[in-house]
From Swiss-Prot:
Keywords annotated in UniProt: Cytoplasm, Methyltransferase, S-adenosyl-L-methionine, Transferase
Protein family: Belongs to the methyltransferase superfamily. PrmA family.
Source organism: Vibrio atlanticus (strain LGP32)
Gene it is expressed from: prmA
Superkingdom of origin organism: Bacteria
Name of the top EC class for this enzyme: transferase
InterPro entries, per database record: Ribosomal_L11_MeTrfase_PrmA, Ribosomal_PrmA_MeTrfase, SAM-dependent_MTases_sf
HAMAP family for this protein: Methyltr_PrmA
CDD domains noted in UniProt: AdoMet_MTases
One Gene Ontology cellular component: cytosol
Name this polypeptide is given: Ribosomal protein L11 methyltransferase
Stored Pfam families: PrmA
Cysteines engaged in disulfide bonds, as pairs: none
Length: 295
């Protein structure tokens, strides 16, 4: 059946309050926040809703809703000026799940690594295949930062190596490292849900025994690895540089992403004292910083 959508605009200071009002007082079935200015947004911290300064709000109602009544309720809330801008439109029903699934295809990284949704055929059965379904919270290979890290891992000889995935999220990098030959991988993340997702995805890929996951405060003392990958954000990469460098064995290698091109040189300066930094690699305004720790 068709739906009715009402589009409003708000600032980040009152967007969540407006969303609550639309759900509780006007009977909206769902409320979605969108960036009105296409500003990049990064993964929020646990429990945080990241909004933009100029936020579009989309409220969805069933087709029988009296939009005049809804607009009167919005006006009566005193959250908008009397002549507030809005747009009402009819949305045709679709098989949203099928449409969502159709958007995801197997992706190849480097010469031999594939990330494949479970509902798709594996293009190269003899290649290194990681089965991972797209989710809402954690990396699945579609973002340039994840792609940069996957390509870096694929280019290494990981046979028998130990690897740390710092900020493991879905576990995509950790699982790829195991499938590429790593003997043992440790995933670290501040979000317990990420640790659960990593273990679940490792189980589905048959590599759960080779993956250990920890919250930062629970990781073993003296933890070191031949290879460390950290796909997080520029701020934590700066703030935690001492910790991250301390995880890399002498002559070990480190790769970091989640860094915009305007941030890369600054982040790299935090690591040059202990690592020889490679040329910075850029993809769609995102960068990968890698290097080898001095022996």
């Amino acid at each position: 059946m068709p739906w009715i959508q009402i589009k409003l605009n708000a600032t980040n200071e009152n967007a969540e309050q407006i969303g609550d009002m639309l759900m509780e007082e006007t009977g909206a079935l769902s409320v979605t926040f969108l960036d009105a200015q296409d500003t990049p947004v990064f993964e929020p911290l646990p429990g945080e809703t990241r909004l933009w300064g100029d936020t579009d709000i989309l409220a969805l109602y069933d087709a029988e809703t009296d939009t005049g009544v809804v607009l009167a309720q919005i006006k009566a809330s005193n959250m908008f000026p009397a002549d507030f801008a809005h747009k009402v439109e009819q949305i045709e029903d679709k098989d949203w799940e099928r449409e969502w699934m159709d958007n995801f295809h197997p992706m190849k990284f480097g010469e031999r690594l594939w990330i494949c949704p479970s509902w798709r055929d594996i293009p190269e059965p003899d290649a290194v295949n990681v089965m991972l379904d797209p989710g809402l919270a954690f990396g699945t290979g579609t973002h340039p930062t994840t792609a940069l890290c996957l390509e870096w891992l694929e280019g290494l000889d990981l046979t028998g190596k130990t690897v740390i995935d710092f900020g493991c999220g879905s576990g995509i990098l950790a699982i790829a490292a195991i499938k590429l030959g790593a003997a043992k991988v440790v995933g670290i993340d501040i979000d317990p849900q990420a640790l659960l997702a990593s273990k679940d995805n490792a189980q589905r890929n048959g590599v759960a025994e080779q993956l250990e996951v920890f919250l930062p405060q629970d990781q073993p003392e003296g933890l070191l690895a031949d290879v460390v990958v950290a796909n997080i954000l520029a701020g934590p990469l700066r703030d935690l540089s001492g910790i991250i460098k301390g995880l890399v064995k002498p002559n070990g290698v480190l790769a970091m992403s989640g860094v915009l091109d305007t941030q890369a040189e600054d982040v790299a300066t935090y690591y040059r004292d202990e690592l020889h930094i490679d040329p910075i690699i850029e993809q769609q305004e995102w960068c990968r910083i890698s290097g080898r720790k001095q022996g």
